[in-house]
């Protein structure tokens, strides 16, 4: 599983002009599911997302996690993160999980997140989404599990 984590001042996801998920300060996370991913992988990634220290402390050092600052968590599925881009001029998506598996694993991640944390929003799996964000920093990390 790959998760592109971005620290944001605010973020929202629209589908067909309708806002389907939004947060204020927090993390926007684009999630790509790979064929070997399952429930255990989702649990491991959620732990990392909630505890990864990307927010500044009183001295400006990245010492605070999402749990520490009580920010929002916006999870958005993005199968293109799992693309193989090593050769050629066109991405190959053979390294991404099939859609049914991707949806199952992503929805499990969302379920675990909502059970563990009060401020969770999502995009819509498989939809053509417009993602709007104010990238804070910018601070962006690619997490893998």
UniProtKB/Swiss-Prot annotation:
* PANTHER family xref list: D-AMINOACYL-TRNA DEACYLASE 1, D-TYROSYL-TRNA TYR DEACYLASE
For this UniProt entry, what's an example GO CC term? cytoplasm
Q: Which GO terms describe its biological process?
A: D-amino acid catabolic process
Could you describe the subunit structure of this protein? Homodimer.
EC number per UniProt = 3.1.1.96
**InterPro entries linked:** Daa-tRNA_deacyls_DTD, DTD-like_sf
Protein family:
Belongs to the DTD family.
An example of a GO molecular function for this protein is: tRNA binding
Q: Where in the cell is it found?
A: Cytoplasm
Q: What is this protein called?
A: D-aminoacyl-tRNA deacylase
Report the catalytic activity. glycyl-tRNA(Ala) + H2O = tRNA(Ala) + glycine + H(+); a D-aminoacyl-tRNA + H2O = a tRNA + a D-alpha-amino acid + H(+)
One Pfam family matching this protein:
Tyr_Deacylase
Predominant subcellular localization, coarse grouping: cytoplasm
UniProtKB keywords:
Cytoplasm, Hydrolase, RNA-binding, tRNA-binding
Task of the protein: An aminoacyl-tRNA editing enzyme that deacylates mischarged D-aminoacyl-tRNAs. Also deacylates mischarged glycyl-tRNA(Ala), protecting cells against glycine mischarging by AlaRS. Acts via tRNA-based rather than protein-based catalysis; rejects L-amino acids rather than detecting D-amino acids in the active site. By recycling D-aminoacyl-tRNA to D-amino acids and free tRNA molecules, this enzyme counteracts the toxicity associated with the formation of D-aminoacyl-tRNA entities in vivo and helps enforce protein L-homochirality.
Q: What is known of its domains?
A: A Gly-cisPro motif from one monomer fits into the active site of the other monomer to allow specific chiral rejection of L-amino acids.
- Keyword Electron transport (UniProt): no
Q: Which gene encodes it?
A: dtd
Motif residue range(s): Gly-cisPro motif, important for rejection of L-amino acids: 137-138
Listed NCBIfam families:
D-aminoacyl-tRNA deacylase
């Amino acid at each position: 599983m790959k998760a592109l984590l971005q620290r944001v001042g605010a973020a929202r996801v629209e589908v067909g002009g309708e806002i389907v998920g939004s947060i204020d300060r927090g993390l926007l996370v684009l999630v790509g599911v790979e064929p070997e991913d399952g429930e255990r992988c989702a649990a491991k990634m959620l732990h990392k997302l909630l505890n990864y220290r990307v927010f500044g402390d009183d001295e400006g050092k990245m010492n605070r996690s999402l749990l520490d600052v009580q920010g929002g968590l916006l999870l958005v599925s993005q199968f293109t993160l799992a693309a193989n881009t090593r050769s050629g001029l066109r991405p190959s998506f053979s390294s991404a999980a099939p859609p049914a598996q991707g949806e199952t694993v992503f929805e499990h991640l969302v379920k675990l997140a909502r059970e563990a944390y009060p401020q969770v929003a999502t995009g819509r799996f498989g939809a053509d989404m417009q993602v709007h964000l104010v990238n804070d920093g910018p601070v962006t990390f690619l997490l893998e599990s």
